[in-house]
Amino acid sequence: MASRFPKFSQGLAQDPTTRRIWFGIATAHDFESHDDMTEEKLYQKIFASHFGQLAIIFLWTSGNLFHVAWQGNFEAWSQDPLHIRPIAHAIWDPHFGQPAVEAYTRGGASGPVNISYSGVYQWWYTIGLRTNQDLYTGSLFLLGLAAVALVAGWLHLQPKWKPSVSWFKNAESRLNHHLSGLFGVSSLAWTGHLIHVAIPEARGQHVRWDNFLSVAPHPQGLAPFFAGQWGVYAQDPDSSSHLFGTAQGSGTAILTFLGGFHPQTQSLWLTDIAHHHLAIAVLFIVAGHMYRTNFGIGHSMKEILEAHVPPGGGLGRGHQGLYDTVNNSLHFQLGLALACLGVITSLVAQHIYSLPPYAFLAQDFTTQAALYTHHQYIAGFIMTGAFAHGAIFFIRDYNPEQNKGNVLARMLEHKEAIISHLSWASLFLGFHTLGLYVHNDVMLAFGTPEKQILIEPVFAQWIQSSHGKTLYGFDVLLSSSSSIALNAGKSLWLPGWLDAINNNSNSLFLTIGPGDFLVHHAIALGLHTTTLILVKGALDARGSKLMPDKKEFGFSFPCDGPGRGGTCDISAYDAFYLAVFWMLNTIGWVTFYWHWKHLGLWQGNVAQFNESSTYLMGWLRDYLWLNSSQLINGYNPFGMNSLSVWAWMFLFGHLVWATGFMFLISWRGYWQELIETLAWAHERTPLANLVRWKDKPVALSIVQARLVGLAHFSVGYIFTYAAFLIASTSGKFG
C-alpha cells in the first residue's frame, strides 16, 4: 500500500476521516511530535529549514528588484523623486476595460501599473543605486544567493554534513559568531558600502566595480586613520544647501555627528548613518570576543548565570539552573528571540517615520503610512508568538526539579499576584479612559463642548522639552538657553538636532495635547490587557487551581468535559487565541492615532485632530467616516478611477473578516450536519457522483475552527484597514 499523507505520523495516516488532512497540515511543523523524532534529528531539521527560509527571502527580494528593473521607472524617478510616482510593477489584466486602462496608466508608463508604497525606491536611491542595470545586477546576485542557501540546506541534511547536538548547544561559540560575524562584520561591511558607494553617489560621484579601487572616499585617504587624527573624517560635512545626488554644496566628511535632517531630502545625513554603523560594528565585534570557547579565556554563560544569586536571599536562588533550562529548550530560545524581534520591529515602525533614513521618504506620505502600519502589525504577531512559545516551553520543556527556587520557579509561585496586578491595571485604564471619552462625547452631543474633561499630558511635554522642544515654554535642559547641556552640545554633538526638533515639517517629537493623552491611555489599556491574557496563558499553562494537571493535556486542548466546574477555554492555546484579537484591536488604535495625527500634519490642519480626538464621535465621524469617502468613491456614476482597486479591496476585506465569525461562533455539530448533507447531495448528483473521496468528511475540531476563524478575522481586518489607509492617503496627496 502506498504511504499516505502525513508520512511523519503513522497514526494519523491511518485515520479514515478528513481529520487526517487538516491535522496533518496543522502538525507538519511540530517536528517534536513526529514519529521516530530524536533530539539530534529535531535540531538538524530546524537548522536545514533555516536555509530554506533564507532562500525564500532572497528570492522575494530578488523579485522586487527584477520587476522594478523590468517594469518600473526607477531611472526616471531618480531624476525627480518628488514629482514622479514610483512604479512597483505592471498590471496585466484581461478584464480591464478602457476606463480601467486609463485609470491605472500612471508614472509615465505605457500601460496599467501598480504604484510602489513600500519605500524600496527611496532605499535603493539612498544607498547609491541609479540605473536599471544596478537593479538587475542586485537581482541576479540575490538569486544566486538563494540557490546557494538551498544547496546549503540540502547539504546539511546529508549524513556527512549533519551538525551534532553538541554543536547546536555550544552557546558561547554561537554568541561569539553571531555577535561578531552576523552583527559586527555585516555592520562594518555596510559602513564600507555607505562610505565607498552611497556617500560618493549622493555627492554626484559614480563609484562602481570599474573605479572602486581608484576613487578614494576621502581626499586624505587612510592617512588620518593611521595618524590617529580621526576628527579629520568629520570635517567639512555637506552644507545645508547640498543638492542630493550632485556635487553642489557637498563636503568631504565621511563620518559625522550632525544630527537632524538633510534639508532637501528630509532624511538623516548619510554621513551620520555611516558613523552609526561603524560604532555598532566596533561594539559588536568586541562583544563577539567576550565568551569562552576553546581558548579558556573570556566569560562562561553558565558561570555568569550561576553567580547571579541576590545576596539578601530575597529572590531565592536567582538565575541558578537557567543556563541548562534555556540551552535545552528550543521553545524558550524561540520565545526570547521572538520577544526581541517583536520589539525591534515595533521600533522600526516608530523610527522609520520619526527619523527617516531614506532620501525623500518623508515627502512620500502614503509610503510612510504603509510602512508604519505594516511594521506595527508584524510586531504584534511576532510578540504574541513569543508568549505562545513561552507557554509551550512550560508544558513540554520546563523541569521543576532543575529550577527549584530560581526566578522561573518564583514566577510560577506568585503568578496570582502578577496576574491580579495586571488585571487591576487593565481595569483601571479601561474604565477611566472610557469614562473620559464617554463624558466628552455626551458633552459634545448636548452642545456644551466647554464642559469636556481635557487633560494636558504635562509629564510627556516636560520630557519633550528637556530634549529641546521649546513650544511648551518649560525652559528646561535642552530647551533652556542657559542650560549647560545646551551650551556644551552646540559645538560637541548634534548641532542639527535642535533645529529638527523645533521644525514643524517633520514628525520628530510631535506636539501633543488632550487628544493624545486620551488615546495614549486607550492604547495602554490594549497593551496591558493583551499582556494580561498572554502572561496568564503562559503562567497557567502547566496547571491552575481549577485544572492542576493541565500540562498532561498539552498546549491546545479544547475542553475536558463539564467536570471540575467546566474546563473549556482554558488551554494555553485559548489564551493565545484571545490575545491575538486584543493585539489586533490595540494596533488598530495605534494606527488610527498615527494616521489621523499625520493627516492633519501633512494637510497643515492640526486643529482637526486636536479638536475631534477628545470624544468618540470625533474618531468615528472625522477620522473613519470622513476619510472613507474617497475609498467608497472608487466606483461612481462617472465610471471608475485609480482608487477602485482599494474600494474593491475594502469590501473584500470586510467579507473575509465577516467570514471569520462563521467559524468563531457556530459549533461543531452544525458543521457536521451541514457536511453530511452536502456529501449526501454530492453522492446523488449525476456527473458529480463520478468524483469520490476515500476519507469520511468530518467537521473541523473546535481548536482548528478557532484557528480558521482567527486567520480570517486577522487577514480581513488588515486587508480592510490597508485599503482604507492607502486610499485615503494617496487620494489626498497623490
Curated annotation (Swiss-Prot):
It comes from the Eukaryota. [4Fe-4S] cluster binds at residues 559, 568. It is an enzyme of class 1 (oxidoreductase). GO terms for biological process: photosynthesis. The keyword Metal-binding applies. The chain crosses the membrane at residues 46-69, 135-158, 175-199, 273-291, 330-353, 369-395, 417-439, 517-535, 575-596, 643-665, 707-727. It catalyses: reduced [plastocyanin] + hnu + oxidized [2Fe-2S]-[ferredoxin] = oxidized [plastocyanin] + reduced [2Fe-2S]-[ferredoxin]. The keyword Iron-sulfur applies. Its EC number is 1.97.1.12. Phylloquinone binds at residue 671. GO terms for cellular component: chloroplast thylakoid membrane; photosystem I. Chlorophyll a B3 binds at residues 662, 670. It is a multi-pass membrane protein. It holds the Pfam family PsaA_PsaB. PROSITE patterns: PHOTOSYSTEM_I_PSAAB. SUPFAM superfamilies: Photosystem I subunits PsaA/PsaB (SSF81558). Chlorophyll a B1 binds at residue 654. It is found in: Plastid, Chloroplast thylakoid membrane. The PsaA/B heterodimer binds the P700 chlorophyll special pair and subsequent electron acceptors. PSI consists of a core antenna complex that captures photons, and an electron transfer chain that converts photonic excitation into a charge separation. The eukaryotic PSI reaction center is composed of at least 11 subunits. This is Photosystem I P700 chlorophyll a apoprotein A2. It comes from Staurastrum punctulatum. The lineage of its organism: Eukaryota, Viridiplantae, Streptophyta, Zygnematophyceae, Zygnematophycidae. The gene is psaB.
